[in-house]
């Protein structure tokens, strides 16, 4: 019995055994037509080397492979989207909290100073104005606390907090680009030195940055809005207040511990006196 194989071009070739004829290069799928005497049977695809996988399963595995590749690259994008969303949420929550938060007051620490012979600086002590080698007399003045972003603490100096404030200050206070060039040309020769470079006979010195300011109002303005100049002393003042509060709590706790043994001794004294009186009566 002989079997005939026919390719897509319609050519027949008698064979003594089983022979496979491949399709033409133009075709995208391989198929073989097998003719037996008396019967005609068509097979969908020719066998390939390796395990036989049906067309539906091949499509399934290809889609699965493509999905796994997509999944392997998706976590980075999802994480970036999650980070941006979390940053947006934190920013919105901080803005809402900032609007709803009541203004708080903070103490600014300063000392009075004066110049000696126009060069040396003497600050105020308990005995009067003396050289800076002596212990100064520290004064306090309250100012409205600048609202900070949530998440900032004393241990982590809020660089992010300052960056947001600087950007907001630049967006609100910066003039137009054309006006900047005009001002630079006009004020190049008329520019005056900043007030903190001018030597004054009398002023107040900020304990945080050691800057001498002409008046107390200027000091409070510096303490509250110093972020406009690229730095802020408010974090230092908050840290000082926090440490003072912690020292006060430790001192109160120490006093309570000292008072508690004295109370116990006072309670034990009457009992000792009663016992001694009973012993004397027995004798």
UniProtKB/Swiss-Prot annotation:
It is found in: Cytoplasmic vesicle, Secretory vesicle, Acrosome; Cytoplasmic vesicle, Secretory vesicle, Acrosome outer membrane. The lineage of its organism: Eukaryota, Metazoa, Chordata, Craniata, Vertebrata. The gene is FAM170B. PANTHER family: PROTEIN FAM170B, PROTEIN FAM170B-RELATED. Residues 1-58, 246-283 are annotated as: Disordered. It holds the Pfam family Spt46. Interacts with GOPC. InterPro entries: Spt46-like. Plays a role in fertilization through the acrosome reaction. This is Protein FAM170B. It comes from Homo sapiens. Keywords: Cytoplasmic vesicle, Membrane. GO terms for cellular component: acrosomal vesicle; outer acrosomal membrane. Disulfide bonds: none annotated. One of its GO terms (biological process) is fertilization. Residues 1-11 have a biased composition (Basic and acidic residues). Belongs to the FAM170 family. Exclusively expressed in adult testis.
